[in-house]
Protein backbone atom coordinates (compact mmCIF):
# COMPACT_ATOMS: atom_id res chain seq x y z
CA UNK A 1 0.00 0.00 0.00
CA UNK A 2 1.54 3.34 -1.09
CA UNK A 3 1.88 6.12 1.49
CA UNK A 4 2.04 9.88 1.05
CA UNK A 5 2.87 12.77 3.39
CA UNK A 6 1.81 16.40 3.48
CA UNK A 7 2.86 19.35 5.61
CA UNK A 8 1.59 22.94 5.75
CA UNK A 9 3.47 26.12 6.58
CA UNK A 10 1.89 29.17 8.23
CA UNK A 11 3.38 32.66 7.85
CA UNK A 12 2.13 35.55 9.97
CA UNK A 13 4.21 38.71 9.90
CA UNK A 14 7.77 37.65 10.55
CA UNK A 15 6.72 34.40 12.18
CA UNK A 16 6.79 31.04 10.38
CA UNK A 17 5.45 27.81 11.80
CA UNK A 18 5.11 24.35 10.30
CA UNK A 19 2.22 22.01 10.86
CA UNK A 20 2.51 18.39 11.77
CA UNK A 21 3.14 15.88 8.95
CA UNK A 22 -0.07 14.23 7.83
CA UNK A 23 0.36 10.68 6.51
CA UNK A 24 -2.09 9.07 4.12
CA UNK A 25 -2.30 5.77 2.31
CA UNK A 26 -3.37 5.01 -1.24
CA UNK A 27 -5.34 1.82 -1.65
CA UNK A 28 -4.40 0.20 -4.96
CA UNK A 29 -7.57 -1.11 -6.58
CA UNK A 30 -5.70 -3.44 -8.94
CA UNK A 31 -3.91 -6.48 -7.54
CA UNK A 32 -2.42 -9.60 -9.11
CA UNK A 33 -1.06 -13.04 -8.27
CA UNK A 34 1.00 -15.59 -10.20
CA UNK A 35 0.66 -19.31 -9.49
CA UNK A 36 2.29 -22.41 -10.98
CA UNK A 37 -0.05 -25.40 -11.23
CA UNK A 38 2.91 -27.66 -10.47
CA UNK A 39 5.46 -26.48 -7.88
CA UNK A 40 8.31 -28.71 -9.11
CA UNK A 41 9.88 -29.35 -12.51
CA UNK A 42 11.91 -32.02 -14.23
CA UNK A 43 13.63 -32.49 -17.56
CA UNK A 44 11.29 -31.91 -20.54
CA UNK A 45 8.43 -30.96 -18.20
CA UNK A 46 5.59 -28.57 -18.96
CA UNK A 47 4.74 -25.89 -16.39
CA UNK A 48 1.37 -24.11 -16.43
CA UNK A 49 1.09 -20.61 -14.97
CA UNK A 50 -2.05 -18.78 -13.86
CA UNK A 51 -2.08 -14.97 -13.64
CA UNK A 52 -5.04 -13.55 -11.74
CA UNK A 53 -5.75 -9.80 -11.89
CA UNK A 54 -8.44 -8.38 -9.60
CA UNK A 55 -9.99 -4.91 -9.90
CA UNK A 56 -11.70 -3.80 -6.69
CA UNK A 57 -12.45 -0.33 -8.04
CA UNK A 58 -15.40 1.21 -9.86
CA UNK A 59 -13.44 1.94 -13.06
CA UNK A 60 -12.37 -0.60 -15.69
CA UNK A 61 -8.72 -0.89 -16.74
CA UNK A 62 -7.95 -1.40 -20.42
CA UNK A 63 -4.82 -1.78 -22.51
CA UNK A 64 -2.79 -3.62 -19.89
CA UNK A 65 0.35 -5.55 -20.84
CA UNK A 66 1.75 -8.63 -19.11
CA UNK A 67 5.50 -9.24 -19.50
CA UNK A 68 6.91 -12.56 -18.24
CA UNK A 69 10.69 -13.06 -18.04
CA UNK A 70 10.31 -16.87 -18.31
CA UNK A 71 12.71 -17.33 -15.40
CA UNK A 72 15.60 -15.43 -16.98
CA UNK A 73 18.88 -15.45 -15.06
CA UNK A 74 22.48 -14.36 -15.62
CA UNK A 75 24.83 -17.01 -17.01
CA UNK A 76 28.40 -15.97 -17.70
CA UNK A 77 28.26 -12.65 -19.53
CA UNK A 78 24.75 -13.17 -20.87
CA UNK A 79 21.21 -14.05 -19.89
CA UNK A 80 19.43 -17.36 -20.44
CA UNK A 81 15.80 -18.37 -19.98
CA UNK A 82 15.00 -21.84 -18.56
CA UNK A 83 11.40 -21.79 -19.78
CA UNK A 84 9.98 -21.53 -23.29
CA UNK A 85 6.44 -20.33 -23.97
CA UNK A 86 4.41 -22.98 -25.82
CA UNK A 87 2.64 -21.17 -28.70
CA UNK A 88 -1.14 -21.25 -28.76
CA UNK A 89 -1.59 -22.12 -25.08
CA UNK A 90 -2.85 -18.70 -23.90
CA UNK A 91 -6.33 -18.71 -22.39
CA UNK A 92 -7.78 -15.35 -21.35
CA UNK A 93 -10.86 -15.05 -19.13
CA UNK A 94 -12.87 -12.06 -17.91
CA UNK A 95 -15.03 -12.82 -14.89
CA UNK A 96 -14.69 -16.52 -15.71
CA UNK A 97 -15.77 -16.22 -19.37
CA UNK A 98 -13.29 -17.23 -22.07
CA UNK A 99 -12.32 -14.34 -24.35
CA UNK A 100 -10.62 -14.02 -27.71
CA UNK A 101 -6.90 -14.56 -27.23
CA UNK A 102 -4.97 -11.31 -26.73
CA UNK A 103 -1.87 -10.34 -28.71
CA UNK A 104 1.05 -12.60 -27.78
CA UNK A 105 4.77 -12.27 -28.47
CA UNK A 106 6.58 -15.48 -27.48
CA UNK A 107 9.82 -13.69 -26.63
CA UNK A 108 11.71 -14.10 -24.43
CA UNK A 109 10.34 -12.26 -22.63
CA UNK A 110 6.77 -13.41 -23.17
CA UNK A 111 4.52 -10.40 -23.80
CA UNK A 112 0.71 -10.46 -23.65
CA UNK A 113 -0.97 -7.16 -24.55
CA UNK A 114 -4.52 -5.86 -24.82
CA UNK A 115 -5.69 -7.12 -21.42
CA UNK A 116 -8.81 -5.57 -19.87
CA UNK A 117 -10.10 -5.89 -16.31
CA UNK A 118 -13.70 -4.74 -15.69
CA UNK A 119 -14.78 -2.64 -12.72
CA UNK A 120 -15.24 -4.82 -9.64
CA UNK A 121 -14.18 -7.79 -11.75
CA UNK A 122 -11.21 -9.95 -12.63
CA UNK A 123 -9.14 -11.24 -15.51
CA UNK A 124 -7.28 -14.54 -15.65
CA UNK A 125 -4.49 -15.46 -18.05
CA UNK A 126 -3.37 -19.09 -18.25
CA UNK A 127 -0.45 -20.31 -20.36
CA UNK A 128 2.00 -23.19 -20.62
CA UNK A 129 5.79 -23.21 -20.72
CA UNK A 130 8.28 -25.94 -21.51
CA UNK A 131 11.35 -26.63 -19.38
CA UNK A 132 14.37 -26.30 -21.67
CA UNK A 133 18.11 -27.01 -21.59
CA UNK A 134 18.88 -23.89 -19.53
CA UNK A 135 16.88 -25.05 -16.51
CA UNK A 136 19.07 -26.05 -13.53
CA UNK A 137 18.51 -29.59 -12.24
CA UNK A 138 21.04 -29.84 -9.40
CA UNK A 139 19.78 -30.48 -5.88
CA UNK A 140 18.35 -27.29 -4.39
CA UNK A 141 17.94 -25.57 -7.76
CA UNK A 142 14.86 -23.57 -8.65
CA UNK A 143 13.37 -21.31 -11.31
CA UNK A 144 12.11 -17.90 -10.21
CA UNK A 145 9.61 -16.64 -12.75
CA UNK A 146 8.72 -12.94 -12.61
CA UNK A 147 5.94 -11.12 -14.44
CA UNK A 148 5.12 -7.42 -14.66
CA UNK A 149 1.78 -5.80 -15.44
CA UNK A 150 1.91 -2.30 -16.94
CA UNK A 151 -0.13 0.19 -18.97
CA UNK A 152 -3.60 1.59 -18.54
CA UNK A 153 -2.35 4.34 -16.25
CA UNK A 154 -1.63 1.92 -13.38
CA UNK A 155 1.35 1.72 -11.08
CA UNK A 156 3.31 -1.28 -12.46
CA UNK A 157 2.62 -4.53 -10.61
CA UNK A 158 5.39 -7.14 -10.20
CA UNK A 159 4.53 -10.74 -9.30
CA UNK A 160 6.64 -13.90 -9.15
CA UNK A 161 6.46 -17.63 -8.56
CA UNK A 162 9.22 -20.11 -7.68
CA UNK A 163 9.29 -23.76 -8.71
CA UNK A 164 11.87 -26.26 -7.43
CA UNK A 165 13.89 -28.88 -9.30
CA UNK A 166 12.67 -32.41 -8.68
CA UNK A 167 15.06 -34.67 -6.78
CA UNK A 168 15.16 -37.52 -9.26
CA UNK A 169 17.68 -39.33 -11.48
CA UNK A 170 17.57 -38.44 -15.17
CA UNK A 171 19.45 -41.02 -17.22
CA UNK A 172 20.80 -40.61 -20.75
CA UNK A 173 22.45 -43.40 -22.73
CA UNK A 174 24.84 -43.23 -25.69
CA UNK A 175 25.88 -46.28 -27.71
CA UNK A 176 29.04 -46.53 -29.83
CA UNK A 177 30.60 -49.30 -31.93
CA UNK A 178 34.25 -50.12 -32.67
CA UNK A 179 36.02 -50.65 -35.00
CA UNK A 180 34.43 -48.72 -37.86
CA UNK A 181 34.63 -50.04 -40.50
CA UNK A 182 34.89 -53.71 -39.55
CA UNK A 183 36.18 -56.52 -41.74
CA UNK A 184 33.90 -59.39 -42.68
CA UNK A 185 33.59 -61.87 -39.77
CA UNK A 186 35.41 -59.37 -37.57
CA UNK A 187 34.68 -58.71 -33.90
CA UNK A 188 32.64 -55.68 -32.87
CA UNK A 189 32.78 -53.97 -29.49
CA UNK A 190 29.74 -51.99 -28.32
CA UNK A 191 30.18 -49.39 -25.59
CA UNK A 192 27.36 -47.84 -23.57
CA UNK A 193 27.85 -44.49 -21.82
CA UNK A 194 25.18 -43.85 -19.19
CA UNK A 195 25.00 -40.37 -17.69
CA UNK A 196 22.84 -39.17 -14.82
CA UNK A 197 21.76 -35.58 -15.51
CA UNK A 198 19.38 -35.49 -12.55
CA UNK A 199 19.70 -34.30 -8.98
CA UNK A 200 19.59 -37.72 -7.30
CA UNK A 201 21.63 -40.93 -7.72
CA UNK A 202 20.21 -43.86 -9.68
CA UNK A 203 20.25 -46.63 -7.08
CA UNK A 204 20.16 -50.37 -7.77
CA UNK A 205 16.56 -50.37 -6.60
CA UNK A 206 15.69 -48.09 -9.54
CA UNK A 207 16.00 -51.14 -11.78
CA UNK A 208 17.68 -49.61 -14.84
CA UNK A 209 17.88 -52.18 -17.67
CA UNK A 210 19.59 -52.11 -21.07
CA UNK A 211 17.88 -54.12 -23.81
Give the residues covered by each predicted segment.
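Exported/extracytosolic protein signature
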Residues: 1-211
Amino acid sequence: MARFTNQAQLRYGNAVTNSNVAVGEILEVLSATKTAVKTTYGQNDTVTYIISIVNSGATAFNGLTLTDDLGAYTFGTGTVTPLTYIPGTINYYINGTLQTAPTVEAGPPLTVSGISVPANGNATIIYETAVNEFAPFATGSDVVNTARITGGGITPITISETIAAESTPILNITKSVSPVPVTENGILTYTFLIQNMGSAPAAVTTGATIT
